Every structure is written in C-alpha cells, then in structure tokens.
C-alpha cells in the first residue's frame, strides 16, 4: 500500500467506523481528492467502492485489519501528523461526532504511535 492509499484509507475508515457513511462525509472525501495534490494519482472512487464492498462483507474486521496495517507502516513525524489531521477532518465532516468515532480514533492514534 502506498502512503497516498494509506491516507485515503485512513479517511475512509474514520468515516465508516460509526456504521454510517453520511453524504457530507462522501462530499468531503471527493472534494479533498479533487483539490489536494496528495491524491492526484489515485482513482479515489475505485478505492472507495472497493473498501465499501470489503467493509460490508467483513464488518469490524476490516477496521481491525486497517489498524494493524498502520501499525506496520514506517511514517515520519510529518506523515503521522498528516494522518491525524486527515482523520480529524473525516470525523468532523458530518458535523456530528459519535462515540464510535472517538473510540476508533483513540485506537487509531495508539496504533499509529
């Protein structure tokens, strides 16, 4: 997995972890992918559709696998801060912060650091 894919998957997992992917969250992802040079080489729609299929099939196991993936990736401090920033943007995108999102974010940060 490239770092760009990891960044996008981080956003996806943060918007999916509460069991509901809101329209505002999808709009934020599309807007970010269209405007941010980090994602210019990715077919974000293809990745998102694939991950939606996977999370529908695997449920929470998909998120657990992601947490293991970030634990095994070598990231410098700047990349870690970018991931945290992207995660926060994703969680705040629907203007509602759910307990499941806070819980996932805590586990995410523990695995990241």
Regions from the language model: what does each represent?
Residues 1-113:
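Small-residue-enriched hydrophobic alpha-helices in membranes
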């Amino acid at each position: 997995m490239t770092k760009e894919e990891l960044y996008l998957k981080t956003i996806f997992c943060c918007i999916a972890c509460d069991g509901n992917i809101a329209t505002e969250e999808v709009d934020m992802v599309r807007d970010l992918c269209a405007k941010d040079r980090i994602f210019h080489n990715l077919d974000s729609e293809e990745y998102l559709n694939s991950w939606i299929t996977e999370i529908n099939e695997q449920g929470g196991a998909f998120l657990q696998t992601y947490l293991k993936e970030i634990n095994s990736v070598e990231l410098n401090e700047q990349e870690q801060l970018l991931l945290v920033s992207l995660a926060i943007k994703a969680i705040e995108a629907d203007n509602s912060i759910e307990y499941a999102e806070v819980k996932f974010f805590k586990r995410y940060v523990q695995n990241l650091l």
